[in-house]
Amino acid sequence: MSTDAIAHEMPRLKKQYREQIRAAMQEEFGYRNPMLIPGLEKIVVNMGVGDAAHDSKVMDGAIRDITAITGQKPQVTKARKSIAQFKLREGQPIGCHVTLRGDRMWEFADRLLTLALPRIRDFRGLNSNQFDGKGNYTFGLSEQVMFLEIDQDKIVRIRGMDITFVTTAQTNEEGKALLKHLGFPFKAKDDPKKAKTKRGPAYYAKKKKK
């Protein structure tokens, strides 16, 4: 295979969406128009850095980390107004964010779902109650170390981030179905280990007779 062919090879998850997931969504929801089948529009990765307003090195580290994780240089987020109690002035840097689209979006989603999330210690799945009512989903990560692109020996500070998957779905139900097909590990609603057995009146009546 030539170098050009490799460079233009379709991302694995994008190919899976086109060849399998679209058909599965069509079967599940019965869309009359194929154009209505939901897809992934963009992914926004946001890293808040409160100390950046007073230490430029902190922001440099955040930019370096998010660039390594996403493969795209982030934009700096600045304070919209001054807050005296936090010694924050309007225009000071408070974080950074990237918006991923196209193949880079699909590649990041694939790495996140297949490599990064499984590396989280005691990971039990993502909360499925964090949709915004329009099929978009946001969740937070408390640190950056689960990403293979981060050299743990060079970590200066643990940094969390918020990740938003923006879809073209019209409802939370459709958005959740799409993300599940993409491989999102949502928590099961009922955990057999934690579920309590429901006992009706007959049980307590027998207990009283004893």
Swiss-Prot record:
Keywords: Ribonucleoprotein, Ribosomal protein, RNA-binding, rRNA-binding, tRNA-binding
GO molecular function, one term: structural constituent of ribosome
InterPro entries the UniProt entry points to: Ribosomal_uL5, Ribosomal_uL5_bac-type, Ribosomal_uL5_C, Ribosomal_uL5_dom_sf, Ribosomal_uL5_N
Encoding gene, per UniProt annotation: rplE
Keyword Ribosomal protein in annotation: yes
Family: Belongs to the universal ribosomal protein uL5 family.
GO annotation, cellular component aspect: ribonucleoprotein complex; ribosome
Compositional bias of kind Basic residues: 195-210
Known role: This is one of the proteins that bind and probably mediate the attachment of the 5S RNA into the large ribosomal subunit, where it forms part of the central protuberance. In the 70S ribosome it contacts protein S13 of the 30S subunit (bridge B1b), connecting the 2 subunits; this bridge is implicated in subunit movement. Contacts the P site tRNA; the 5S rRNA and some of its associated proteins might help stabilize positioning of ribosome-bound tRNAs.
Lineage of the organism: Bacteria, Bacillati, Actinomycetota, Actinomycetes, Propionibacteriales
One Pfam family matching this protein: Ribosomal_L5_C
Record's protein name: Large ribosomal subunit protein uL5
GO BP annotation list: translation
Description of how the protein assembles with itself and partners: Part of the 50S ribosomal subunit; part of the 5S rRNA/L5/L18/L25 subcomplex. Contacts the 5S rRNA and the P site tRNA. Forms a bridge to the 30S subunit in the 70S ribosome.
Segments for region (Disordered): 188-210
